[in-house]
Amino acid sequence: MNLQSPHLTIEMTQEIFYCQEALSLESGESFPEFQLSFTTQGQLNANKDNVIWVLHALTGDANPHEWWSGLIGEDKFFDPSKYFIVCANFLGSCYGSTQPLSNNPNNGKPYYYDFPNITTRDIASALDKLRIHLGLEKINTVIGGSLGGQVGLEWAVSLGEKLENAIIVASNAKASPWIIGFNETQRMAIESDSTWGKTQPEAGKKGLETARAIGMLSYRHPMTFLQNQSETEEKRDDFKISSYLRYQGLKLANRFNAMSYWILSKAMDSHDIGRGRGGTPVALSNIKCKVLSIGVDTDILFTSEESRYISKHVPKGTYREISSIYGHDAFLIEYEQLQYILKSFYLENNG
């Protein structure tokens, strides 16, 4: 980590933040201690006002170069030669942070199914402890898509004037029944795996393959599959789309964990920034920072109407839209449009 240095450093470093303080959860439960895996790149400027905090989606990690390579990195929009870039793996995720396979400090054994249900607000609270640990009094920009956008919006509420800009991409202020329904069907797929319920790291792996295949149908748009998975010859079986979905399921199951998927999908379901704050419109109206809400015209999971709703109810809101055939996943694909939108926003709102 290179908070301040007389030499320009853009090499990314990965570290573990060990928090010995208890983290109280919305459920009333708590973690007596926890850890977050995080990366930093670049350095703080003299005014300490160049912090960009990147928030990953459901199965992401703390290395945004791998999943947002068109936006973050040398000579990209968020260039570490100009910004101090932070990205932390969420609480509950399986890339180095406290998660269901971590040992419970109360008994020294893995949590497994005793891992507490967490919310997007809990995830934001854990991130804020890391912010304090890093000595960051203010953040220039929090940016995230999907689950990352939900966490970003929660964090924007609690950060108040410590945050200058929140960029919320393909996300919402409250989880819709549609999203919860998709997540529930995926958890049902995991439950149907005969290994689910067993105290072993690989439990639910085959079910996770199916869950991911279901998820892929919501991350894209029918036009995506029509363009990329249509057959060029007459067939009665062995369709491209079938092998594609099986491949995507296997690919995720080999790099992720079913228990983390379960926990984070539940966190996504829990998202409601108005809970305990007088309702969603009131919570949005209390956000102090400038908010850029970006929707995708073909997103069937987090609809563009939900993104537009955010911008209408925050005091300093801007709405922009990505046009794409790729549905929800457009925020990870349409870099040219994203860069244009971001450039316009910063020019208009940040001098």
Curated annotation (Swiss-Prot):
The keyword Transferase applies. The active site is at S146, D299, H328. Its EC number is 2.3.1.31. Substrate binds at R212, D329. It catalyses: L-homoserine + acetyl-CoA = O-acetyl-L-homoserine + CoA. Keywords: Acyltransferase, Amino-acid biosynthesis, Cytoplasm, Methionine biosynthesis, Transferase. Gene3D superfamilies: alpha/beta hydrolase. It comes from the Bacteria. InterPro entries: AB_hydrolase_1, AB_hydrolase_fold, HAT_MetX-like. Pathway: Amino-acid biosynthesis; L-methionine biosynthesis via de novo pathway; O-acetyl-L-homoserine from L-homoserine: step 1/1. GO terms for biological process: homoserine metabolic process; methionine biosynthetic process. It holds the Pfam family Abhydrolase_1. One of its GO terms (cellular component) is cytoplasm. Transfers an acetyl group from acetyl-CoA to L-homoserine, forming acetyl-L-homoserine. NCBIfam families: homoserO_Ac_trn. Belongs to the AB hydrolase superfamily. MetX family. HAMAP family: MetX_acyltransf. Homodimer. This is Homoserine O-acetyltransferase. It comes from Cyclobacterium marinum (strain ATCC 25205 / DSM 745 / LMG 13164 / NCIMB 1802) (Flectobacillus marinus).
